[in-house]
């Protein structure tokens, strides 16, 4: 049964500026080391950062809340399976929230076109 859905759209040019400025402290606050390594290895890293940020926002919207009760941006991580499909990996407070809500699966879809990155998250429970 679907528990919640969330969608977020991000202007990639915001992340273009952040990458150009080398705003490492902000990236370290928003992304896990694994996410930063993945994005930095891409030709247009700002696009990949924007997609991951949109996915984190979409997850919070699907849950019906924002960052609170000690949850951090690192608690929601975007990883790729062996075929390259994006998945959400939950840690800390996000994992506890998923357990408390009896979530059984998370689905994430990422896309980009021109200056925009979009993420859709669907949360399911039994």
From Swiss-Prot:
Top-level enzyme category: transferase
SUPFAM superfamilies (alphabetical): 4'-phosphopantetheinyl transferase
An annotated Gene Ontology molecular function: holo-[acyl-carrier-protein] synthase activity
Cysteines engaged in disulfide bonds, as pairs: none
Keywords in alphabetical order: Cytoplasm, Fatty acid biosynthesis, Fatty acid metabolism, Lipid biosynthesis, Lipid metabolism, Magnesium, Metal-binding, Transferase
Catalytic activity, EC: 2.7.8.7
Signal sequence region: none
Keyword Lyase in record: no
GO annotation, biological process: fatty acid biosynthetic process
Subcellular location: Cytoplasm
GO annotation, cellular component aspect: cytoplasm
Keyword Phosphoprotein belongs to the record: no
Reaction catalysed by this enzyme: apo-[ACP] + CoA = holo-[ACP] + adenosine 3',5'-bisphosphate + H(+)
The protein's name in its UniProt record: Holo-[acyl-carrier-protein] synthase
Organism: Geobacter sulfurreducens (strain ATCC 51573 / DSM 12127 / PCA)
Gene giving rise to this polypeptide: acpS
